[in-house]
Each structure stands twice: as structure tokens, then as C-alpha cells.
Amino acid sequence: MTRFFIVAFLIGILSSCENENEDNNNINADYTVFAGNYYYDPQNLTINVGQTVRWINDGGHHDVNGEINSLNNEPFDNPEVFNSDAISEVGAVIFSYTFQTPGVYHYDCSVGGHASNGMIGTVTVNTID
């Protein structure tokens, strides 16, 4: 009987974790960028002010770094600074960001040598006319 309660308890905990991941993956976004082994897809994206981009892990351990260029350790000098923690869970939302200032935003994956292997991207944010 005790085993039954332990198993039921563990199933309940695992079910609640699954629901949290589903909620995280359902973040409203205008655009989605996939982050995989040394790539962001699409690598270059053009959006309007006020639109939201979310980055989804397509495999591996990745982040979204829009603060310091991982290749030269210089600031990107983006109109707004953004960055995320690294995520390993496949299919999980790495990061979601709503761009409020027009301009060109550069970012990379600062994990290991990912940026030097081509894991870089840009988001161009246009004003709404």
C-alpha cells in the first residue's frame, strides 16, 4: 500500500513539472527562432517595434546573449541589452523578448565556442509607420 502512495505521489510531481514546461512553451510570440547545434534559425530576422521573439532549444545547451560579443569580448552596443540563462532541455523556451526600440540587435550563444562556430544572429527592429 505504501508503494502505491509513493508511486502516485511521484506521478503527481512529474505531471506538474510537465505542465510548467507546457506553459513556458506557450509564451505568446510574434516570431520564433530555433537554437541548435551551432545555429539560430532564422539567423537574421526583421520585426516591428513592440513585437516579441522567442528562442526555442532545438538541441544542445544554449543561451541568447545580446550583451557582450563572445568573439571579441566587446559590448554589442545594441539599442537594448538582453541575455538569458543557458538551457539544455530540447523544445524548451530559452528566452522571450519584446523589442521596444528600433535598430539592429546582434546576439550570439556564449556557451563554449558556439559563437565561433557560427552561432550568431541579428534582429532588425523597424518602426511602425
Where are these regions (language model features)?
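Sec-dependent signal peptide recognition
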Residues: 1-7
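Winged-helix/helix-turn-helix nucleic-acid-interaction surface
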Residues: 10
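C-terminal motif of bacterial Sec signal peptides marking the signal peptidase cleavage site
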Residues: 13-16
